[in-house]
A protein has these predicted regions:
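Short acidic low-complexity segments
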Residues: 64-77
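Internal, well-ordered domain-core segments that constitute the primary functional module
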Residues: 132-213
Length: 450
């Protein structure tokens, strides 16, 4: 069997590329793949090239490696396209999203999925994703795009809307990652869990979540989670080595809703109107909500990356540990025909009955030589669907804004955001949007400045 060509757009995300390729090179069918790295930042691209070459030597991978600053050249003849970039980066754009919102009285935690921060990020990002789709249509029309770029739902929706012929799936690690976290909270082996999960990106819920018993049968762990939370045994501290994020919000939502949500407490806190309010420091303290978490995380990650890069340069080998990312599983399944199941973000074509048709949903997908095949869920519990709809409203209006180049719909999307609407009045929301658009300047599409 011939080897595939795997193109990374945003290869300057070196740690992410290392994790994905560490998985890829453990797959016999992918070990000889041609790896094409593409990034506009020449320094970061060279850093990634050094790390990937050393990674290949460490695991005995023998494929070709090439690196490019021209996107179309990198995409030529690709079988798989992995997309992972952040338009505008931490500086200036993330800093702008947080500073401007704070100036208008709106606090945020992550700001990459919903709210004014997520909306601005979508407006910055979608034109670049469309440009990739243009190039793929020309030079690798049969390739499968594995998209890791946030805001996932809006990005995926916008690409489906304009480029329905592109094979693509939006990928996140929150479904499998949260399952591992909950296993840790209960001192279980994650391999003993099975679950069924569905919803929208960053707001999917485990409709069933079970552990395997000694006799081979399965039983729900929801009673165990609730009891562990009541006893103070869960959540366990220092999740992912970050003492600021204590995961209280999601356990409280489990108590209220009866189901556990996939994305982190710091994310979920800003998707709803309940946790972040002016003058309510008591709520922040009670639910351990870490304001400005993403900027802090960016600063720490940048510092850590410089240390990691130096260690990679000095060492003869790079240790390869399996990641929780789905990318290599998907590539292997499509390339070899060996079936697998992943959770992906796809168009809602009769998959979830009580969410809007055509929106972006996160469901289990069968993957084999026929590609990515989403599975039908049916109807979600009504209260979960209602909660998701509040987020889908924002996604719908933002997608409409960028498809029609209509600035009014940017205002509408921001007005409908649950957190923003709970804090600001209508005129304040319009003023905030105007300030964000002006502050971001040319990072945003030209039609927003007409």
């Amino acid at each position: 069997m011939s080897a595939p060509k795997i193109t990374f757009i945003g290869a300057g995300s070196t740690v992410f590329v290392k994790n994905i390729l560490g998985d890829v090179f453990q797959r016999p069918a992918l070990k000889s793949a041609h790896i094409a790295l593409m990034d506009i930042d020449e320094t970061r691209l060279e850093e990634s090239h050094i790390v990937v070459r050393k990674l290949m030597d460490s695991v005995g991978a023998n494929g070709e490696i090439s690196y490019h600053r021209d996107r179309k050249t990198a995409l030529q003849g690709a079988d798989f396209v992995v997309v992972a970039f952040q338009i505008g980066g931490y500086e200036p754009c993330t800093v702008t999203d947080f500073a401007v919102c704070k100036r208008h009285g709106l606090e945020q935690t992550i700001a990459d999925t919903l709210g004014p921060g997520g909306i601005m990020r979508a407006l910055r990002t979608i034109p670049h994703l469309w440009a990739i789709c243009d190039d793929m249509t020309e030079v690798c029309p049969d390739a499968t795009m594995l998209n890791y770029v946030n805001p996932m739902a809006m990005n995926t929706w916008a690409m489906y809307a304009r480029y329905p012929h592109i094979k693509q799936v939006g990928l996140c690690h929150s479904v499998q990652g949260t399952a591992e976290e909950l296993a840790r909270d209960l001192d279980l082996d994650p391999a003993d869990l099975r679950y069924r999960c569905a919803g929208i990106n960053h707001m999917a819920f485990y409709l069933s979540l079970e552990k395997k018993l000694a006799d081979g049968s399965y039983v729900s762990i929801y009673p165990d989670l609730l009891q562990a939370y009541a006893d103070g045994r869960a959540p366990k501290p220092n999740l992912h080595g970050n003492p600021r994020c204590e995961n209280i919000v999601r356990y409280e939502m489990l108590k209220k809703l009866g189901y556990f949500v996939t994305e982190s407490s710091e994310h979920f806190a800003e998707y709803t109107p309940w946790f972040i309010k002016p003058g309510r420091d008591d709520l922040l303290a009670r639910y351990k909500v870490p304001l400005d978490e993403y900027p802090k995380r960016c600063v720490e990650q940048l510092a850590n990356w410089h240390q990691e890069l130096e260690s990679y340069k000095r060492g003869e080998r790079i240790e390869v540990k399996p990641s929780r990312e789905y990318a290599s599983t998907i590539m292997n399944a499509i390339w070899t025909g060996e079936p697998s199941v992943v959770y992906g973000n796809v168009r809602n074509d009769n998959l979830i009955d009580n969410l809007p048709q055509g929106c972006c949903v996160e469901v289990a997908c069968l993957v084999d030589a026929n590609g990515i095949q989403p599975t039908k869920v049916g109807a979600l519990p009504a209260h979960l669907a209602a909660l998701m709809q509040t987020n889908i409203n924002v996604q719908t209006l933002l997608t409409q804004a960028i498809l029609t180049e209509n600035r009014d719909y940017v205002y509408y999307a921001t007005m409908m955001d649950p957190h923003t609407a709970a804090v600001l009045g209508i005129e304040e929301i319009y003023a905030l949007v105007d300030d964000l658009i002006a502050s971001h300047g040319d990072w945003l599409p030209a039609w927003l400045h007409r």
